[in-house]
UniProtKB/Swiss-Prot annotation:
The keyword Transferase does not apply. Its cofactor is Mg(2+); [4Fe-4S] cluster. This is ATP-dependent helicase/deoxyribonuclease subunit B. Belongs to the helicase family. AddB/RexB type 1 subfamily. Residues 1-278 form the UvrD-like helicase ATP-binding domain. It comes from Bacillus subtilis (strain 168). Its EC number is 3.1.-.-. Keywords: 4Fe-4S, ATP-binding, DNA damage, DNA repair, DNA-binding, Exonuclease, Helicase, Hydrolase, Iron, Iron-sulfur, Metal-binding, Nuclease, Nucleotide-binding. The gene is addB. Changing residue 210 to A: No longer recognizes the Chi sequence nor generates the Chi fragment. The keyword S-adenosyl-L-methionine does not apply.
């Protein structure tokens, strides 16, 4: 029995020596005793490939490459150690989730933390660490109870942590005893079964690529030393460490410590020990500067490198994106100009998660094949999401979010249906469910989904053919979504045990054809060359089956709730990872500086060399803190390295990365993150400057104009990248900056290609201005027709912003509807409630002034009850919260009807029209305009309320409009066409009064009635009558009145002098109007109505002529963009030269009337 220790610095040729030795052995005796090459998991593929490509051998039987886990499987298969099933990390996490729920009341520290996401995984990692370091549950319990830990900082926190962990550890071992094996037990079993393994006896074993070993692994190595014929240990170190452990500040502390322990064990076993120390740097024979870096990295003081050097490049970038794109360009240059293959290039990062997603995006753009080393989570795979969301549907009472998470995995889609069509149907159904608030038994009960595009609270319309077609499609889509999930729900309710629930879930997957659908996706991915994706589909299905099998194996007969079942499935799913091998040989390797292993790398890029990243700051996200670990170490408990030791080992990891390439090393760092926050360079960059004082940093930039013309050529990598950078350079040229001739040449090449449509579209965007051209008359006619029928509010929308009108009425764009009660819905309810009360009064031959308080309450209650089922898809009946809202609305309607009754008692005006229609089937004709361009425009709508009164002037009419917001009539808004409704309604009523009422009427005014439930604030105590009086004042109507005292007295018969409590007017002692009254003369009313008509005429002509410009107004701080639904469509941006608000000047009513009079005079003379 013998042991050889092979020692040398990085690049000295240790691995190559081992491979040569194995190859020589294979040539000498192809069928001799076994040769075992033991390496880390990440290195097995590389070493197998290196041995397999030996030119003069057609294959190998004698030599095999193993990791510890693969060696364990091999030995245990041959020696009978596989009698009990192994539980993977996934199975252990599911078991732990169950144990946590069962024992959380016994915890001292982790009662609350145990419910948090990720806790199960942290505990599993901790218990795995205990196993790796050969600590039994009893050891942990003893430490918790001994009081030793409690001395730590005078607190019992560590003791209580160990108490909680010992409970879970003990219960886990109890659950596994004699039935299953923890995934970490394989090494313990391996050590026990090596004496029985014939393959080990007489074997030659080579151990390479490791920096350190766990106690479990040391036990295995001890048995290998005892039973193998010869074992060779290869370790990266500057000298043998057989007399003492190295000092903790030495660069090779980690490997030196490992060397010492292995050497001591070999001595204990009386092995024949030989030593081989490799000096020199075989890897860097052609690159003396890299040899200098390897030799001097840890030297203090450093010896500067005086010669010319090209093998090292330090690069600074503005951000990570610029850094990665610069590296992609450099890789292209290495492959294109220097003759390298992609497989010769490696990219290493200390925090690869900062770059992972960006690597995929950038390398796809630059057409660089790559392989990202490491295991990716399966959580985002459609199958895992399908299972999780399906269980969420059952647990969450069929919330639409969970249902559509499930459906959008596309694993529920009908087999062999066109996916594009099904996706469209699913989107339509999702919009419907969001708008109608579909959840719970509304999915599963037999009632069909009812679809109505337009719903009125006042009228019932028959369904249109389009609505019927949509309704049928929605129900057909629902009919293939619900049955499988509903069947799963029924089976889960019936299932009691874990096995029954697992069977229900598996049957659900089978019945929805998930295996077949995944196989189709796998085949599609293979056909398209997406090899990794194809592997992932197969691995995901295998992982789910294994998860369910382990679940049933562990606790198949246990009765658990659906909630706990889901938690355990979630815990298991969170631990599932893809394990992939490189799908091709010629790829750039992207790895982790800590875990990845490389061999034969020519060029290495080290990314993200920033302060706090390289060397990395240790994190303390584990169950035990660094202080906990340090304390346990002082009492002889060995665990994995704490933060302090990990920080000491960082320089070794950096050294290994820097010495990994044979030809070129690139070190880069960004100076800002994605949010623009400053990032500082690492101390390593400073160290490189000391070692190479003549070296100049390069700048990696995505702005070619910052580098020379020759360097700008590097940006022309391929067509898509060239298009992007050419566009950015031409954009500078449009701003009158000089650009290199490189880009004009590139532009000419791109535009001369046969396939130049994409380039043409891209470059045309350089001259884009966020403007909309006026529609051609023919297009306008196709959109609107020769005869426009619209509403007053539509004209107001046009005057506010022509593009908003075009989006809503030309393109018919609509916002997604949500199942929630909004202000327009409440306003609609108030209007319709007051109409119903008015209709009931008319039926009972009552007047508003006759209403009692009890009648107000009864009528209001009945009105809201009748309307609630029609309002916003029955939202007021959908929940207890909305029932409460309904009661509040009933109280408001009661309050309002009481105020209207009081107003009626104090008024000479009486209602003669409620919800009075004009146009269509209404009693009044539409407001019609013959436009100059030959089109006709009709305005139709409804007037909330028209009141009449008899006076010495004859018949008076006024308009009352119900508003759920406090509003008055702003004549500036009237002038600019933003508030046209009230004067239009008055105009129509007056114009057609002779035909409608039998006599010509005079305008009395327009008033807004604010529907609300006011709160009264007072510094003094008030009696009930005083409170009612204050509330009454809050309902004062605002608007514009005819400036006549008789009219004012008719509107408020209680008014003698002073301000009215009913209208915004008042009388002086002599009976004349107060100056603060909102009143004008009859002539001014005539001017205003004529101005409104002119405004309609102009708007109609502009609409039909095709005006669609992006021109929102701005008056004071008010702009229609604030609540516009189409901001994302027009993309109005005030910072753009062509986008400016249309300024409207706010003036007093007197000034506005003067403007209108001047315009009217001008029109008369023209």
């Amino acid at each position: 029995m013998g042991a050889e220790f092979l020692v040398g610095r990085s690049g000295s040729g240790k691995t190559k020596l081992i491979i040569n030795s194995i190859q020589d052995e294979l040539r000498r005796a192809p069928f001799g005793k076994p040769i075992i090459f033991l390496v880390p998991d990440q290195m097995t593929f590389l070493m197998e490939y290196e041995l397999a490509k030996t030119p003069d051998m057609g294959g190998m039987i004698r030599a095999q490459v193993f990791s510890f886990s693969r060696l364990a499987w091999r030995v245990l298969q041959h020696t009978g150690g596989m009698s009990r099933p192994f539980l993977t990390s996934t199975g252990v996490q599911m078991l732990l989730r169950k144990l946590i729920e069962e024992h959380k009341q016994e915890f001292k520290v982790y009662q609350k933390a145990s419910d948090k996401s990720g806790f199960t995984a942290q505990v599993e990692r901790m218990l795995t660490e205990f196993k790796r370091y050969c600590l039994e549950p009893e050891d942990i319990r003893r430490m918790a109870e001994s009081g030793t830990a409690s001395e730590y900082r005078g607190e019992r926190v560590l003791s209580e942590k160990l108490h909680d962990l010992s409970i879970l550890y003990q219960q886990m071992e109890k659950s596994l005893a004699d039935q299953y094996l923890h995934s970490e037990d394989y090494l313990t079993l391996l050590a026990e079964h090596i004496p029985l393994a014939e393959d080990i006896k007489g074997a030659h074993i080579y151990v390479d690529g490791f920096y350190q070993f766990t106690p479990q692994e040391f036990r295995v190595l001890e048995q290998l030393m005892v039973h193998a014929e010869h074992i060779t240990f290869s370790l990266t170190a500057d000298k043998p460490s057989y007399e003492r452990e190295p000092h903790e500040l030495e660069l090779f502390r980690m490997t030196g410590k490992t060397y010492y322990r292995l050497h001591q064990k070999a001595k204990e076993l009386n092995l024949d020990i030989t030593y081989k120390e490799l000096s020199g740097t075989e890897r860097h024979t052609k690159t003396p500067e890299l040899a200098h870096l390897e030799a001097q990295y840890e030297a203090r003081p450093a010896i500067p490198y005086a010669e010319k050097q090209e093998a090292l490049t330090v690069m600074q970038a503005a951000n990570r994106r610029a850094e990665l794109e610069g590296i992609a360009r450099e890789i292209h240059a290495l492959v294109r100009e220097k003759g390298y293959r992609y497989k010769d290039v490696a990219i290493l990062a200390r925090q690869p998660e900062d770059y992972k997603d960006m690597v995929k995006e950038v390398f796809a753009d630059y057409e660089i094949p790559y392989f990202i080393d490491g295991k990716a989570s399966m959580l985002n795979h459609p199958l895992i999401e399908f299972i999780r969301s399906s269980l969420d549907v059952l647990k969450g009472n069929w919330r639409y979010e969970a249902v559509f998470r499930c459906v959008k995995t596309e694993l529920l889609f009908p087999l062999n249906e066109p996916k594009a069509k099904v996706r469209e149907q699913v989107d339509q159904l999702e919009n419907y469910c969001i708008a109608y608030g579909i959840k719970g038994d509304r999915w599963t009960k037999g009632d069909r989904f009812q679809y109505r595009r337009f719903v009125s609270l006042d009228d019932d319309f028959a369904q249109t053919d389009q609505e019927i077609e949509m309704e049928n499609m929605l129900n057909d889509t629902r009919d293939w979504i619900v049955p499988p999930l509903f069947q799963l729900q029924k089976r889960m309710k019936k299932a009691k045990t874990v096995q029954e629930k697992a069977e229900a879930l598996y049957r659900y997957l089978e019945e929805t054809d998930v295996p077949l659908k995944l196989d189709q996706e796998r085949q599609r991915a293979e056909d398209d060359g997406r090899i990794i994706e194809a592997q992932q589909h197969q691995q995901a299905w295998d992982a789910v089956i294994q998860l369910l099998e382990e679940f049933v194996e562990m606790m198949g007969d246990d009765e658990i709730s659906l909630d706990l079942f889901q938690q355990m499935i979630e815990a298991g799913a969170e631990s599932l990872t893809f394990s992939l091998i490189p799908p091709a040989l010629d790829q750039v390797f992207v790895g982790n500086m800590d875990l990845s292993r490389m061999y034969g790398t020519s060029c290495t890029f080290v990314l993200g060399a920033n302060d706090g990243v390289l060397p990395a700051r240790p994190d303390e996200n584990g169950v035990l803190s660094d202080d906990d670990r340090e304390w346990l170490k002082t009492i002889g408990v060995e665990l994995s390295s704490g933060g302090r030791e990990r920080l000491l080992d960082e320089h070794f990891l950096i050294y290994m990365a820097f010495s990994s390439p044979s030809d070129r090393l690139y070190v880069s760092y960004p100076i800002a993150d994605a949010e623009g926050k400053t990032l500082l360079p690492s101390m390593i960059v400073k160290r490189l400057e000391e070692l190479f004082p003549h070296h100049k940093e390069r700048l990696l930039t995505n702005e070619p104009e910052q580098v020379s013309d020759e360097e700008q050529l590097m940006y022309v990598v391929n067509k898509s990248v060239a298009q992007s950078f050419t566009a950015s350079q031409l954009r500078l040229w449009t701003r009158e900056y000089d650009i290199s001739d490189v880009w004009w040449s590139t532009y000419n090449v791109l535009m001369s290609e046969q396939d130049r449509l994409q380039s043409k579209k891209l470059f045309s965007s350089l001259f884009f201005r966020n403007e909309v051209k006026q529609l051609e008359r023919s297009v306008s006619r196709q959109l609107y027709g020769e005869r426009i029928q619209g509403s007053v509010s539509r004209m107001e929308t046009f005057n506010a912003c022509p593009f908003s009108h075009f989006a809503s009425h030309g393109l018919h764009l609509k916002e997604r509807q949500f199942f929630k009660l909004e202000a327009p819905d409440i306003g609609q309810l108030f209007h319709s409630s007051l109409k119903l009360i008015s209709d009931r009064l008319r039926e009972q031959k009552l007047d508003w002034r006759d209403l009692t308080k009890e009648q107000c309450e009864l009528f209001s209650y009945d009105a809201v009850e009748r309307l609630a089922p029609k309002l916003q898809k029955e939202i007021l009946l959908s929940s207890n919260r909305h029932y409460y809202v309904k009661e509040k609305l009933q109280k408001i309607v009661t309050r309002v009807s009481g105020i209207l009754s009081e107003h009626a008692k104090a008024s000479g005006f009486v209602p003669i029209g409620l919800e009075l229609g004009f146009g269509g089937k209404g009693p009044l004709p539409p407001l019609t305009f013959q436009l100059k361009n030959g089109c006709t425009m009709e305005l139709v709508g409804r007037i909330d309320r028209v009141d009449k009164a008899e006076s010495s002037k004859g018949l008076l009419l006024r308009i009352v409009d119900y508003k759920s917001s406090d509003k008055g009539l702003d004549l500036a808004e009237v002038y600019y066409g933003l508030a046209l409704q009230m004067l239009t309604y008055l105009d129509l009523s007056i114009t057609h009064s002779a035909d409608w009422l039998g006599m010509r009427a005079t305008p009395a005014g327009v008033l807004y009635f604010h529907i609300h439930d006011p709160m009264i604030q007072s510094n003094l105590p008030l009696g009930l009558d005083e409170i009612e009086q204050e509330i009454f004042k809050k309902f004062k109507m605002k608007g514009l009145l005819l400036g006549d005292q008789e009219v004012v007295r008719l509107m408020d018969t209680t008014l003698q002098e002073g301000r009215s409590n009913i209208i915004n007017a008042g009388l002086k002692k002599d009976g004349s109007l107060r100056s603060d009254s909102a009143a004008v003369g009859e002539k001014e009313f005539d001017l205003l109505t004529k101005h409104v008509r002119r405004t309609f005429q102009e708007a109609g002509e502009q609409i039909t002529d095709g005006r669609v410009s992006i021109e929102p107004y701005k008056m004071k701080n008010k702009t229609p963009c604030t609540y516009c639904a189409f901001k994302s469509v027009c993309q109005f941006d005030e910072s753009l030269e062509e986008n400016e608000y249309r300024p409207l000047k706010a003036e007093k009513d007197k000034t506005i009337l003067e403007w209108i009079k001047k315009e009217a005079d001008g029109n008369e003379h023209s």
